[in-house]
A protein has these predicted regions:
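Anaerobic metallocofactor- and corrinoid-dependent redox/one-carbon enzyme cores
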Residues: 1-257
């Protein structure tokens, strides 16, 4: 239904208002949202038999976060042009702790979206994805999540926001690290174990700096194939956003060569 509505109204990105509007009257839509954000997803057909958005994701912004929706669409199209994996998502910026061990010695954030991430972000794609019933405390009518542990690799992170009636964007580079299963379980159980998790390291931005500057509880993330490309793609994305009239702020360690 969501994909058919997007086709009918000519939408390039959509959000479903189940938080807070629909959560008390219908099941949560996270499983659908995670699938729609994945390029390789089950096909959807129009009533006349056309396959809708064939071979592409339909970027979806969780909780109808319109700034995240704008970021999702721009990032998906730009990364596709750059030959990079275009699947992207927002996450809740929850909490973090310094972790030492297993090749990691850094402050590692808990990025946790409230229900669904694209399977392309998981280590083994769909094979490592699962679906849990949404916690009744948040979603009394249930609904399935799209859950997994995000794979290690370089990322570009960002946040588009409105300040002084002008669109701004903070962006930088980071890394997803691989933590041991017991540490992943500890972090999951300290937050919401039904939801997908990403172990995020934000390069050059401390915990206190992030908490002081970041303008939302959401952070947007997308992978690149290597670290050098992450820095280059971050710069290209900043240029694209600036050309659209968005005020850009580089945050942390972004290389300019």
């Amino acid at each position: 239904a969501a994909v058919r509505m997007a086709d009918a109204y000519g939408c390039a990105t959509i959000g479903i208002q189940y938080q807070q509007g629909l959560k008390d009257i219908c099941a949560a839509s996270d499983l659908v949202e995670g699938l729609l954000n994945n390029t390789h997803r089950p096909p959807v057909y129009a009533s006349d038999g056309r396959e809708l958005f064939a071979g592409k994701a339909l970027p979806h912004f969780n909780e109808v976060d319109e700034c995240a929706g704008l970021d999702a669409l721009i990032t998906y199209e730009l990364w596709s042009q750059l030959g990079q994996p275009p699947e992207n998502t927002l996450h809740d910026l929850r909490w973090g702790q310094h972790y030492s061990g297993a090749g990691v010695d850094d402050f590692v954030w808990v990025f946790l979206i409230s229900g669904a991430a694209p399977p392309a972000h998981f280590a083994d794609g769909y094979k490592s994805a699962s679906s849990d019933r949404q916690p009744a405390m948040f979603f009394p009518k249930g609904g399935g999540t799209l859950k997994g542990v995000s794979k290690p690799g370089p990322i570009v992170w960002s946040r588009i926001y409105l300040e002084g009636n002008v669109l701004h964007a903070d962006l930088g580079v980071g890394e997803v690290v691989d933590l041991p299963a017991e540490e992943t379980a500890r972090r999951w159980n300290g937050t919401t174990p039904e939801w997908p998790i990403m172990h995020g390291v934000i390069k050059g931005v401390s915990r206190d700096q992030m908490m002081a500057k970041h303008k939302a509880n959401h952070i947007h993330v997308v992978y690149t194939t290597d670290e050098t490309t992450a820095h280059k793609a971050c710069r290209i994305k900043a240029a694209a956003l600036a050309q659209l009239g968005i005020v850009v702020n580089f945050c942390g360690d972004v290389r300019f060569k």
